[in-house]
Amino acid sequence: MKKVTLAAALLISAGAASQNFHLSQYDASVQYLNPALTGIYFKEKTDYRINANFRQQWKALASKPYTTFSAAYDMKYDDKFGVGGFLINNRSGAGNLNTLTFLGSGSYRIADDQNGPHNLTVGIQMGLFYKSFDPNGFTYDNQYSASQDGFDVSIPSGETFGKTGIVRFEASMGVFYKYIEQSKDAMPFIGFSVYHLPKPNESFTDQKSRMPMHFIVHGGSDFKINDNLKLVPTVLYMNQARAYDLNMGLSGWYRIKDTDAEVMLGVNYRWKDALIVQVGYKQDQHIFRISYDINTSYLNAFSGGRGGLEFSLVLCGKKGEPLFKPVSRIN
């Protein structure tokens, strides 16, 4: 009975983790946002892109904080196709519930700016995820020791599990539209994507537990204020079963005079959850950003406002050329 109860608790925590993992800098991990963004909308001097995100949250509430790490590579195959792949790892709390996902991505431009300002792209992803947990990371009722006034993990739990890891097939799809007209001051964009298309069984027991499909709608616009300043309002809506996220934000990019460098400042609000502040720096199409979530939900009473710290790095390069420009020497 204890094993069944623990397994049920694991399934609940697994579902909660899959719904509560956020990337505040979601636009820095485009394949995680929408497979239709794979290998597209590069600048003229860019053929490929490397990006990575790291996030840690709930450090104030859990003995082991929730962590998310992602890494990705994508490139344009020609003027119509983009290909890439990404890996993301989520690890949550006690029991080290871990989900490692690897997906290959592909995109196709149905319409592009060679024929006009309207750009429409579709994309698909396929791959595998591995989900596991460590039963030694939990405590059990028979490990309670009155003499120690707490749990003694050196006492055998007496519990056995048929399996502590599963591998499942994963797939997703998306569509993305962007209006691109360099002579215009506003260039809007919107996308839609669906993840967990096969509704994989994520149960560690013989009882099936299907992962609900995850729906994402995202959009915004690039507004050119002048030659040095750009404002980008954005909105993100995600829904999975009965859980949803609404994220609204505004960021500003300012080009430093007489340089190719830009600095960025942004503020987002995740509905009934967190206020997100982020800063960034861009040089030669490489972007580094750091953000912090200030918790505003009911958990604020326990977290003291401390939410999640996140970093992202995006590197863009051209085939046959160094990824980083050599530093000029001062004579």
Where are these regions (language model features)?
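Subset of outer-membrane beta-barrel
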Residues: Q19-N331
